[in-house]
A protein has these predicted regions:
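Phosphate- and other anionic-substrate recognition elements at nucleic-acid/protein interfaces
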Residues: 1-175
Length: 175
């Protein structure tokens, strides 16, 4: 049996990606749909598919994030979990580093180095630009997919990219 995989990138500008067994993809912006619309979207995906499974990014508070943005992340994640449960769609919470480790390859990596002081030594620390690296991965894996939020946008939407790559992670892991 072939499954439909859903990748959910929570956040105010998050995205939902549905990857169907026939090779079709659907993308929905969280900020352009209210909770009821997202519920209808998930219900519609489930009604059109024999088997559906979802991956929801397991986001946590970031060190530099404000309390308000952390609360908003948690609220949206909770709403998405509730909608998945209400629609009886099984889901897996996945840490960003886990799906990134599965999807990224060395050629995708955008790396810089910053100097940090440890004790009395200066050392160079490797810093991966996660957004650019994910964009490179999506371009490599899905060259036919428009990664912009919509046709009017000029820039690639990293939230859409992440939700697409999470759906691919679910497919690879056969979750």
């Amino acid at each position: 049996m072939e499954k439909t995989y859903i990748g959910l990138d929570p956040g105010i500008e998050g995205f939902v990606t549905a990857m169907f067994p026939n090779g079709n993809y659907e993308f929905y912006s969280i900020d352009e749909n209210d909770d009821l619309a997202l519920n209808r979207i998930l219900k519609s995906i489930k009604e059109r598919s024999w088997q559906v499974t979802a991956v929801l990014e397991d986001v946590h508070a970031l060190f530099s994030a404000s309390a308000k943005s952390t609360f908003n992340f948690g609220e949206i994640k909770g709403i998405l979990k509730g909608l998945l449960v209400a629609n009886e769609i099984p889901y897996t919470l996945v840490q960003p580093k886990d799906w990134q480790r599965e999807i990224w390859i060395n050629q995708d990596m955008i790396v810089s180095y910053k100097t940090v002081i440890r004790g009395d030594k200066e050392i160079k620390q490797k810093v991966v630009d996660t957004k650019s690296t994910s964009i490179n991965s999506a371009r490599r894996l899905f060259p036919q997919i428009d990664l912009r939020k919509n046709e009017r946008c000029k820039k690639i939407d990293d939230n859409k990219v992440d939700s697409l790559l999470m759906a691919e992670y679910a497919r690879r892991k056969n979750l």
